[in-house]
Amino acid sequence: MSGLRTVSASSGNGKSYDSIMKILLIGDSGVGKSCLLVRFVEDKFNPSFITTIGIDFKIKTVDINGKKVKLQLWDTAGQERFRTITTAYYRGAMGIILVYDVTDERTFTNIKQWFKTVNEHANDEAQLLLVGNKSDMETRVVTADQGEALAKELGIPFIESSAKNDDNVNEIFFTLAKLIQEKIDSNKLVGVGNGKEGNISINSGSGNSSKSNCC
């Protein structure tokens, strides 16, 4: 695995910022990655979200410990046919959010495979966070204690969230960004890349979009 290098950055419209953080959301299809991202960036919720095809990203600039930080947030497709495409985006990621659906035990079980993929393709310095989404649902099958236990086993922080109710959504991104900023401040991790404002979708293959429930 390669390390991350520093690049001084400023946006095209003349506004400067201290660093860019590239953050990925990964996990099985339908766990609500896109809904978490849209809730955080746009404060919107759509219960029937179009499944991500390939890669999508959004930008949000936030204040982290007094520093202006541009978050480049990448939403990856969870379907198996896109794994080769999406793993290419792990390199250079400063933070990775592993998401499962608390109403679907399979997505929880698969987190270990996602974690293995991260170890194979991401930088050693990347900060990780486990998220159990759809915590508002009464049909929960994965308990918070199970999530905590898995996070402890993997050695990473854990948060439960609901994109629908806007529970802990901001906490997810700010917690991870603060961990990254602490590494940057201690010179163990450094900002990378230049971001472009907006929402870009990269499609690949001949797969069709499909709707999935999003909470």
Curated annotation (Swiss-Prot):
SMART domains in the record: ARF, RAB, RAN, RAS, RHO
GO biological process per UniProt: ascospore-type prospore assembly; autophagy; exocytosis; Golgi to plasma membrane transport; membrane addition at site of cytokinesis; protein transport; vesicle fusion
Disulfide bond entries: none
Compartment(s) where it occurs, according to its Swiss-Prot or TrEMBL record: Cytoplasmic vesicle, Secretory vesicle membrane; Cell membrane; Cytoplasm
Database matches in Pfam families: Ras (PF00071)
InterPro entries in the cross-refs: P-loop_NTPase (IPR027417), Small_GTP-bd (IPR005225), Small_GTPase (IPR001806), Small_GTPase_Rab (IPR050305)
Gene3D superfamilies from the UniProt entry: P-loop containing nucleotide triphosphate hydrolases
GO cellular-component term (any): transport vesicle membrane
Record flagged with keyword Methyltransferase: no
SUPFAM superfamilies named among the record's database cross-references: P-loop containing nucleoside triphosphate hydrolases
Function: Involved in exocytosis. Maybe by regulating the binding and fusion of secretory vesicles with the cell surface. The GTP-bound form of SEC4 may interact with an effector, thereby stimulating its activity and leading to exocytotic fusion. SEC4 may be an upstream activator of the 19.5S SEC8/SEC15 particle. SEC4 probably interacts directly with SEC8; it could serve as the attachment site for the SEC8/SEC15 particle.
Subunit structure as annotated in this protein's UniProt entry: Interacts with the guanyl-nucleotide exchange factor SEC2. Interacts with SRO7, YIF1, YIP3, YIP4 and YIP5.
Motif (Effector region): 49-57
Gene Ontology MF annotations: GTP binding; GTPase activity
Phosphoserine, modified sites: 201, 204
Coiled-coil blocks: none
Listed name of the protein: Ras-related protein SEC4
Annotated lipid attachment (S-geranylgeranyl cysteine): 214-215
Taxonomic source organism: Saccharomyces cerevisiae (strain ATCC 204508 / S288c) (Baker's yeast)
